[in-house]
Amino acid sequence: ANAVMNGKNWNSTVLFYSYDETGGLADHVVPPLPPKDAKGEWMTDPYDKKKGKVPTGPGFRVPFYAISPWTRNGGVFTEHAAHESQIMFLEEWSKAVGKGFHTKEINPWRRAQFSNLVNMLDFSYHDGSVLKLDEVPEASKDPITDQYNGADVCALKFRSDVQPTVPYNNTEAQSLRVEKGYKPVRGNLTEGHYLTFEKDGKALQHKGHKLSLTNACNDHDGKDMRFVLWWQGKNPKDNAFYISTADKHDR
């Protein structure tokens, strides 16, 4: 990130950080399933053919974030996305610069239902200033072979504590715990969040079974201000939701 922000093309750059593992027990939000007739989305279970056709995905959520002059005011991107979304973003970018391409390996259902990530960027707000990030020490290398040896150095330093046993001191009771916090949302809405609706310092509340406006709170977590979306569609981009108060969700 330091190299990109200090580079000559920073003002026209987006840097994606993508992961393929969660590092946790599980995701508390069930991913959408494709319809049975979606081409390329179902296969015969290779380990137990008696189970018949099983979906190849989409899977649980994994960390993914972007750094860009057009993402500087922060937020949580809430659209359904998969690794193919990054390829579709490149397709959109290539079309914009007059060198369009089309990836035939992305099947029609995923192309139609998953985000191309364009809504992750806010083109109405641009901040090209450079943040000073913490310095990261250079990765350890073996002085003789010049090969990276971080794992060996870590094992030598911490001895038997370097490889904790699965599930890394987590318990099943903790598996659905979510870190408390708040951020504005970007993109089309999806399930899996408490939502507050605010504007100009005011928030929508449902106190006493009536909707009204009240002063927003600093942490945006007032119990009477939280709402929950329930997906009612058949495909991710149906954008059909039932909205309820959070107390209906907590029972």
What are these regions (language model features)?
Residues 107-192:
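C-terminal "exit" segments of structured domains
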Residues 36-93:
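Substrate-binding rim/cap in mid-to-C-terminal beta-strand-loop elements of soluble/periplasmic
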Residues 2-42:
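Metal-dependent active-site segment of extracytoplasmic phospho-/sulfohydrolases and closely related
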Residues 1, 5, 48-54, 70-81, ...:
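Active-site rim elements
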Residues 80-88, 92, 111-115, 198-202, ...:
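A structural signal for well-ordered alpha-helical segments within the folded catalytic domains
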Residues 2-9, 91-98, 122:
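Sec-exported extracytoplasmic/periplasmic mature domains
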Residues 160, 164-251:
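Lectin-like carbohydrate-binding module/patch detector with strong preference for beta-trefoil
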Residues 8-15, 22, 60-62, 70-71, ...:
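Loop/turn elements at helix/coil->beta-strand transitions in domains of secreted/extracellular proteins
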